[in-house]
Amino acid sequence: MFLIASVEHKGAAMAEAPIKRALISVTDKTGIVEFAQTLTKEFGVEVISTGGTAKILEEAGVPVVPIESYTGFPEMMDGRVKTLHPRVHGGLLCRRDNPGHVADAENNGIGMIDLVCVNLYEFEKTVADPSVTLENAIEHIDIGGPSMLRSAAKNNDFVTVVVDPADYGRVLDEMRVHDGATTRASRQQLALKVFKTTAAYDGAIAAYLSGVVEAEQSKFPETLLVKATKEQDLRYGENPQQSAAFYKMPGAPAHSLANAQQLQGKPLSYNNLLDTDAAWAAVREFDDPSVIILKHQNPCGSATAENVVEAYDRAFACDPVSAFGGIIAVNREVPLEFVEHFADINKQFVEVLIAPSFTGEALERLSKRTNLRVLATGGIDRSRELEMRTVDGGLLVQDLDHADEAADSFEVVTKRQPTPEELNDLVFAWKVCKTVKSNAILVAKDQAGIGMGPGQPNRVDAALLACERAEAACERMGIDSKNLVAASDAFFPFRDNVDTLAAHGVTAIIQPGGSVRDDESIAACDEYGIAMVFTGKRHFRH
């Protein structure tokens, strides 16, 4: 029979709560042996433990009271029932300043438990495996762990609860300062972490089961549970007067921005993250070697070529002025030749360079530009399905938009068919135009986005702006401004868009179609000898 620690626990809610007895049961064994050894050797704490945790502690020489000895009941039902017992939860929930609670504990042989150290079955890791079965997932739903955590956290006036191995040192340091006790402020903070953890844990379970039970409906469930973990505080938000932080979503694709490794450079800012995400989303639309140079969410330079060095040359030439302070995204490993070329032709400031990987020689050369942020994603992943945006008091969720229309699905609506060269450029322009803010027109030639008309309230202004920039780019690149192609993210409401494009050397157009005046635009194309194709899919980007 264990002694009931009652007298020393009586009294009002304590600013300092002594730790005499601890219950330890963890899935993540990181640092647990050292933590338990210090509790027992330095502070004389009695340790109760369960299953695998008890075994590890005993092997390390830590005196352990097995949970079944403490409760008087064996672990049952394959371990499903081991800590769900009054001697456990009574010892956690008893208010030491309540005479009735203390009397109940004494009359029922319940001792006080002053510290709970528990972390949970790795449910999210389990269900992240595509081959996981429902049965296996359910077996990884922790019951006893959350129950103990919640009991201890509820009674944080008297009980210290630790759910994160990162807090072991903090608790021990405080016990050294306070003669084996913890402070109320620390216990409250640790309890808050517990409730955040258990809420997120239950949310992950609900999200998984929603996907299994609700099937297709689960994409947009009645209740959307979003768990995000703070990765870092940011220096400021979109502007210096705005504070900001970056959070990582659960199940982030392996090669996403959230999982990218920063290899060098200053910390990423809020605007860096926004623009890098847009640039990475744009460049991963392409299968061939491609480079996107992006500024303020718009691709001011874009090109596809036989290799990334040539693609960078042509993307930079599209608009060198706008490239200043931009983001460069590459969809291939970056070799030394790229970096040398990049350093030679681009003396301007670049915020971020992102690619799947970099050769060692490339990184060595890049290290000379200490302020340049270099990110490696480890690969290209197109598995992301949804995107979210906030509105005042709400959250918008939609399918991610992909420019995945194949050329053989296009409908040629004009008398003239596009040439093979025009068709290749149309496919390229269509993918780039999708990433431009609406209303958007993108003029291209030879697999380069030489003219961009982004974010205009009316489409004809977007067309005019794109054409003017294309003419300037052609002059700068030493190529003629004829035989250009144009992409529009949405249909032409009037034929004036065709008139504008035709006047500036455009010979082929790609757009969704669907306007009540499509016939007028088609007739205008036929007048100018322009080939036009409809994709049947719009790509607004707001």
Describe each region flagged by the PLM:
Residues A15-I24, L115-Y121, Y201-G203, G211-H542:
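ATP-dependent carboxylate/acyl-activation modules
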Residues G52-F123:
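Glycine-rich nucleotide/cofactor/substrate-binding loop typically near the N-terminus or early
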Residues V33-F43, E124-I141, S147, A279-D288, ...:
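Short, hydrophobic/aliphatic alpha-helical segments
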Residues R96-I143, R150-A152, T414-P420:
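Active-site/ligand-binding-proximal alpha/beta "capping" segment
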Residues M148, N155-V171:
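Mobile "lid/hinge" segments at catalytic clefts and subdomain interfaces of large enzymes
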Residues T40-K41, E58, D142, A153, ...:
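Anion (oxyanion) recognition and catalysis
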Residues F2-Y70:
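N-terminal glycine-/serine-/threonine-rich phosphate-binding loop
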Residues P165-A166, R170-L224, L234:
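Non-catalytic interaction/clamp surfaces of large macromolecular machines
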